[in-house]
Amino acid sequence: MKRILTISAIVFLAAAVAMPGIANAQDNAWHQKDQVLSAGVGFGMYGLYGSSTLPPIFVAFETGVAEKITLGGLVAYSGSSDDFGYGKWKYTYIVISARGAYHFLEHQPKFDAYAGAGLGYDIVSASVTWNNPGFEAQFGRFYSASASYFFFDVFLGGRYYFSPKWALLGEVGYGVGFARIGVSYKLN
């Protein structure tokens, strides 16, 4: 799966570089003062347990701080559950991440390609609800645990602007899902 996503990302970026460009810098898809809000879904998040899984749903914001550099943040939520006969585990993941990216294509009016990194914090909680009254009497109605950790996010992505403000988003990397798709909207 990771191999397919990596090959897809390389083909996607190679096609964008090969597209004929317009020599006017104003026609770039990304500008220094741009502010972009994105939302979407991730696939293949590390650490998800259970037979029923909600993939990571994310919202991200980024703003230009230099000609090709952006800084921003991302918040994501994911959950899963596992029914094991005498009870049901429920896992919840809340991710908060700071990100930075370098936008490396020029003279592409509809395509924005970038690579970046981030540092995030994953808040993980787990709880169990017992199906067996004997377990409930022995352990209590609920049993819960939590564990949170920092993680490093590395990503390669691109946006295809199908209008001046709206774009389709695709990213591959490690952090909030091995692959992410969504939509982006330029706020300015």
Roles of regions detected by a PLM:
Residues 6-8, 52-53, 150-151:
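Short hydrophobic/aromatic segments of transmembrane alpha-helices and their interfaces
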Residues 21-63, 103, 175, 182-188:
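Short glycine/proline- and aromatic-enriched beta-strand/turn motifs that initiate or cap beta-hairpins
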Residues 36, 43, 55-134, 160-162, ...:
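Gram-negative (and chloroplast) outer-membrane scaffold detector with strong preference
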Residues 44-46, 83-89, 139-144, 167-169:
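Extracellular loop and loop/strand-boundary signature of outer-membrane beta-barrel proteins
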Residues 62, 102-112, 122-124, 141-188:
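Gram-negative outer-membrane beta-barrel domains
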Residues 129-145:
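Solvent-exposed loop segments that connect transmembrane elements
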